[in-house]
Amino acid sequence: MAEKRNIFLVGPMGAGKSTIGRQLAQQLNMEFFDSDQEIERRTGADVGWVFDVEGEEGFRDREEKVINELTEKQGIVLATGGGSVKSRETRNRLSARGVVVYLETTIEKQLARTQRDKKRPLLQVDSPPREVLEALAKERNPLYEEIADVTIRTDDQSAKVVANQIINMLESN
């Protein structure tokens, strides 16, 4: 990979976007960004607080702006928030400005990976987590698929193995 293309990771919560993104950036010697962490850095508050105070719509507005700015950079790996694809503008920008990698996972893996994580505002509701994740998958999976240049299942694989798969796929294209 002579020229460093932007790599944008999309997928549901618990797919491993942040962990795999860090690994990928390290292996490729690229700068890593996480859109949720960038929102937290800019607001001085965690994502849950932003959701509570501004609602999902306010959070999504911030997310769209952050992703727009970050995707204008060159040679980065960006882990996006699971719901960022709800915005048509964001989907268009991701598609136009880099390679989109959809990290796919099962509901079971999502449950296992997110069960103790209190920083998941969409899971801090009265509905059972499985029902929430199934509803989100039904809404968002087609959007991930729509913009994905590459799809990789992350179940039962280490971040390093998935990062290597992504690198191999990018080098062969």
From Swiss-Prot:
Locate the residues binding ATP.
Answer: G14, A15, G16, K17, S18, T19, R120, Q157
In what pathway does it function?
Metabolic intermediate biosynthesis; chorismate biosynthesis; chorismate from D-erythrose 4-phosphate and phosphoenolpyruvate: step 5/7
| Chain residues that bind substrate | D36, R60, G82, R140
Tell me the superkingdom of the source. Bacteria
Where is it found, in Gene Ontology cellular component terms? cytosol
Alphabetized UniProt keyword annotations: Amino-acid biosynthesis, Aromatic amino acid biosynthesis, ATP-binding, Cytoplasm, Kinase, Magnesium, Metal-binding, Nucleotide-binding, Transferase
> Could you give a GO molecular-function term held by this entry?
ATP binding
Name the job this protein performs.
Catalyzes the specific phosphorylation of the 3-hydroxyl group of shikimic acid using ATP as a cosubstrate.
Q: Which family does it belong to?
A: Belongs to the shikimate kinase family.
- Recorded protein name is Shikimate kinase 1
Originating organism: Yersinia enterocolitica serotype O:8 / biotype 1B (strain NCTC 13174 / 8081)
